[in-house]
Curated annotation (Swiss-Prot):
Compartments (UniProt record): Cell inner membrane
Gene Ontology cellular component terms for the protein in this record: plasma membrane
Residue stretches spanning the membrane: 33-53, 99-119, 141-161, 213-233, 234-254, 268-288
Enzyme Commission number, as recorded: 2.5.1.39
This protein's name: 4-hydroxybenzoate octaprenyltransferase
Domain of life: Bacteria
Reaction it catalyzes: all-trans-octaprenyl diphosphate + 4-hydroxybenzoate = 4-hydroxy-3-(all-trans-octaprenyl)benzoate + diphosphate
Organism placement in taxonomy: Bacteria, Pseudomonadati, Pseudomonadota, Gammaproteobacteria, Enterobacterales
Organism in which the protein naturally occurs: Cronobacter sakazakii (strain ATCC BAA-894)
Length: 290
């Protein structure tokens, strides 16, 4: 009986950290890898690569915990989130706070193996991760904060590898913000009706009937900014082929969200994993010497 209770609690933590749903970690991982490859160039130090990959998974888990903690009063009123561990009572508020602290401490221990500038930048990463879930109460632009939080690994990666923050770093950072606002608006379109009822704000609500147009413009901005990164760093045809593939996926996303069907919008959101993957493959191939 005791083992059964322990097993149930571990499964609840597993769901709270979303380790059963890796999409969020992947959307955080791809821009991190882009930055490491451009900063290196093409050959990131193995330890730095390992630290950032592990940090992505730990901080994404921490972000999910604090997100559910912030939304614990709202999630019970939304069909998709009503059975999450906090509103269902499978995890207590104290347990969630303790888990968040443990995940952040583990992440910080990893960062301590890097240079001082990167350690200092990690403080901003924690602040952004903590701020994002609460922004939904005060602004219709929480997705911008999410983009900054998901993109902060980019300056950290550049700083860890080269101790510098060149123009390419910031172009990639702003590309990631545009990308995150686009894909998280698709995600928010799934819950838009419920969010309006309970008073949660999002870009999906702010953009209204212009949502598809603005998502499309953001996607164009992503490709333009990443294209400029490629030009500045002398990247070759493989990189631009990757961007072309990403552009084709953006067109497909526009097609399926045309009717604003909830399931279709969620599929469009999930498809962004392949956008990040294609850009990374093109980037990695561009640095290989054939």
């Amino acid at each position: 009986m005791e083992w059964s209770l322990t097993q149930n609690k571990l499964l609840a933590y597993h769901r709270l950290m979303r380790t059963d749903k890796p999409i969020g970690a992947l959307l955080l991982l791809w821009p991190t890898l882009w930055a490491l490859w451009v900063a290196s160039p093409g050959v990131p130090p193995l330890w730095i690569l390992a630290v950032f990959v592990a940090g992505v998974w730990l901080m994404r888990a921490a972000g999910c915990v604090v997100n559910d903690y912030a939304d614990r009063k709202f999630d019970g009123h939304v069909k998709r989130t009503a059975h999450r561990p906090l509103p269902s009572g499978d995890v207590t508020e104290k347990e969630a706070r303790n888990l968040f602290v443990i995940l952040v401490l583990l992440s910080f221990l990893l960062v301590l193996t890097l240079n001082v500038k990167t350690i200092l930048l990690s403080v901003a990463a924690l602040a952004l991760a903590w701020m994002y879930p609460f922004m939904k109460r005060y602004t219709h632009l929480p997705q911008v904060v999410l983009g900054a939080a998901f993109g902060w690994s980019i300056p950290m990666a550049f700083c860890a590898v080269s101790e510098s923050l060149p123009l390419s770093c910031w172009l990639m950072f702003f590309a990631n913000i545009c990308w995150a606002v686009a894909y998280d608006t698709e995600y928010a379109m799934v819950d838009r009706d419920d969010d309006v009822k309970i008073g949660v704000k999002s870009t999906a609500i702010l953009f209204g009937r212009h949502d598809k147009l603005i998502i499309g413009l953001l996607q164009i901005a992503v490709l333009a900014l990443l294209g400029t990164v490629g030009w500045l760093n002398g990247l070759g045809a493989f990189y631009y082929a990757g961007l072309a593939g990403a552009g084709a996926l953006f067109i497909w996303q526009q097609k399926i969200i045309a009717g604003r069907d909830r399931d279709a919008c969620f599929r469009a959101f999930l498809n962004n994993n392949y956008v990040g993957l294609l850009v990374f493959i093109g980037l990695a191939l561009s640095y290989l010497k054939f």
